[in-house]
């Protein structure tokens, strides 16, 4: 598929901006300026740049610990990125997120995750919100080859398939999960062909080839927006720096292997050679583009070094939302006595009637009405999209609820039995409890998790959950 001159230029600008910024951050990490880990995207720039060139601010992306490139390609200013890694108040998350937790929802950057897997589920949640709100945009999780051996990958693809979510799963197979070769860690030697097992489109492409990426993402976008068909795209690529700055790099691979990718398969060199071969840009024009970016990154770096740290007095800001600030629980003309089941059913019905952003999801809550009849009749009244029966995958649908809340919906998670929430602890503790804080309040978390347990039936010590930070248990 042909790409126009201006679009090619934009892709190249994104790619070189990522490369220059990452090299600058790598040096800064060596000098101790980066607070925390620093995982660079060097060698993989073609994927983020080409994919994000086809998106707008309403298309949502969810990234990984190696997320600088996706953030920049989506439109994050280098100054905000560098500031965030330096822990400065001028960072995109006001210094609370750091390298692995970058947020700017106004441009569709919904966050990066230091934990492998959750962003896949969150992207499914955003896809669910898109369908709920009848929008025509897409949700895209970027993840590495290591994530495909994680349960979140299976649960995410399955949910996207059965609910026709407009999600494009992009696996950046850079050959190593930290230092473990993909050839060792996976029984299946490819990722793209796994899509067909879930009833979705699957592609295996060269992740360093701008033209192949462009052709595939255009097709996947068409399927997602017009037909609500999810896709899985495996981009085969290679990171040419260590897993994280400061880590030993040549115990599990050789310098010769790395240099082969740096010289012969570098995506930036490939597109530069294409420009020269096709006479799209000459050496002087390419240098001018690079010089402009070099100057911008240098200025951003210096400004970030000089920027202030957050005030100590703000350390606990954004831990909680303002609780019931605009509500009046006493504004009722009459009262009645009900048991917990009846009261839950009445409140769900009342709130769903007045707020179409609310949906309920859980096992057996549809026509069956749930184990304790708390949703009985709501399926017929509000439909399958708002009263959603789920597979048995607590981690999966709680992670989806997290992403749905991040993107504007108000999910109510209904656990068949409350002790089943143990299976979703990772999503509750590492994601739901922390996203609002790490995003400096840019992303809210209007999510309710509820469930019942039979009287006299001891299955778990639920009160231990009271010790979880940022959670309110009723």
Residue ranges and their predicted role:
Residues 49, 107-171, 175, 205-223, ...:
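Thiamine diphosphate
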Residues 175-180, 200-205, 250-260, 285-286, ...:
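Short beta-alpha connecting loops at secondary-structure transitions
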Residues 340-341, 445-463:
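Cofactor-binding beta-sheet edge motifs in enzyme active sites
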Residues 464-470:
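Conserved small/polar residues in nucleotide/adenosyl-binding loops
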